[in-house]
């Protein structure tokens, strides 16, 4: 009986020493690029949306890791969704701990419609100058969007995720020239 107990303890020690699954608990890091495209709100010349945070959730108590915007010092990134109809641009990119991820969270902090003129410059930047003419600020009751999709960030690897911000479904007119946004964002692909 004593031999069985000793062998059981020895077997448990050997199993513990072998460590866990390297995919779930890697020691390195990899790169995640989050790209954005759109099918925008059709009645405007520009739809400027400011994102204040992008995070990725790592499986198994890994918690959330913040994904920097294109410029690592930027605290937000603004995109003119009208310019992203037939193209895509970078929302965030950075190094994350390698591992298995289950969710990306995107926070929209502000949005505005511009009816008379398109915006100048790139589709996405730290700031975009507001176009001239008539505009409407969009109320955003809850700007946090949780995108549940499993993906892996490999050690020394690169993962790219493309999201589609559906401007038509996200923006509704509430009357008296007022607008409300409930962000509708889907994941198109993960590579």
Regions found by a protein language model. Give the residues of each.
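Residue-level signal for mature regions of secreted extracellular proteins and peptides
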Residues: 11-12, 72
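Compositionally biased amphipathic helical and low-complexity segments enriched in hydrophobic
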Residues: 8-11, 25
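Bacterial N-terminal signal peptides that target proteins for export
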Residues: 1-7
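C-terminal motif of bacterial Sec signal peptides marking the signal peptidase cleavage site
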Residues: 14-17
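A short, solvent-exposed, low-complexity linear motif enriched for acidic/polar residues
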Residues: 19-191
